[in-house]
């Protein structure tokens, strides 16, 4: 068991988490066939400006558009990647979908709900998550419970306090939500908590690119999954004596029954 990349997780465990995320990337991109690509319609004006202003080739634009279409799915899976990674740390367990919490310390003194970005939750979802985490705190009186935002606007490890709901007629303020053992933590702070190492998140940020390249090289995995769709569109454009952009325009708008197409 070696620790070439991270001091707190073995290379084997890290590679297992990388393989999970790589597989999810492949599923998401390969799941976009010809029909799905055009399902929500392409903004061909933005396409034209993107390629012209950013000096993108047609294939580069297509790869970027595919990435945009799967962005939400991939972002969720990156959050799961962190859950799985933290679950590999000694003394912690990652729980699959269906359990009340994402990660817990085996002695029941820490529970966490992990989101990948600070803007994942909005409105009533914030209140619902808070109440859910409060439930862990009430059930386990010795536990500190966390709402973790891996990519946050600042480094933090604070009691989670916020206001939400209708404004009270007397106080002229929205109801305040807080619990002494429910905290909000950024990715750097939470990795420090679960590993005991100040630079744990920094290690991860700098060494993931190296580990990913090594894993891809070892597995001889392919980079990028847009070539199949590109080839299909290119061959169709060639047969119709059009550029790729013209072919996308000719497919896109008739699907919405636009005038003159």
UniProtKB/Swiss-Prot annotation:
Cited Pfam families: RE_Eco47II (PF09553)
InterPro entries registered for this protein in UniProt: Restrct_endonuc_II_Eco47II
Keywords, sorted A to Z: Endonuclease, Hydrolase, Nuclease, Restriction system
EC number: 3.1.21.4
GO biological process, any: DNA restriction-modification system
Highest rank taxon of the organism: Bacteria
GO MF annotations in UniProt: DNA binding; type II site-specific deoxyribonuclease activity
Subunit and interaction comment: Monomer.
Record's protein name: Type II restriction enzyme Sau96I
Organism: Staphylococcus aureus
């Amino acid at each position: 068991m070696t620790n070439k990349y991270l001091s707190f997780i073995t290379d084997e465990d890290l590679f297992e988490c990388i393989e999970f995320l790589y597989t999810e990337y492949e599923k998401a991109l390969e799941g976009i066939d010809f029909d799905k690509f055009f399902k929500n319609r392409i903004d061909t004006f933005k396409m034209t400006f993107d390629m012209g202003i950013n000096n993108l080739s047609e294939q580069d634009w297509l790869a970027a558009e595919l990435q945009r279409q799967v962005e939400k799915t991939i972002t969720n899976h990156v959050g799961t990647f962190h859950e799985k990674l933290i679950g590999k740390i000694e003394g912690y367990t990652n729980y699959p979908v269906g359990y009340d919490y994402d990660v817990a310390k085996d002695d029941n003194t820490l529970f966490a709900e992990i989101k990948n970005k600070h803007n994942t939750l909005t409105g009533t979802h914030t209140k619902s998550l808070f109440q859910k985490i409060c439930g862990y705190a009430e059930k386990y009186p010795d536990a500190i419970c966390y709402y973790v935002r891996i990519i946050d606007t600042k480094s933090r490890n604070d009691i989670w306090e916020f206001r939400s709901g209708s404004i009270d007629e007397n106080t002229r303020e929205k109801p305040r939500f807080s619990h002494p053992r429910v905290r909000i933590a950024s990715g750097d702070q939470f990795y420090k908590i679960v590993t005991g190492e100040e630079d744990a998140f920094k290690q991860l940020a700098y060494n993931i690119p190296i580990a990913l390249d090594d894993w891809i090289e070892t597995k001889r995995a392919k980079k990028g999954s847009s070539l199949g769709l590109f080839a299909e569109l290119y061959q169709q454009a060639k047969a119709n004596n059009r550029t790729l952009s013209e072919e996308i325009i000719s497919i896109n708008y008739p699907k919405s029954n636009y005038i003159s197409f």
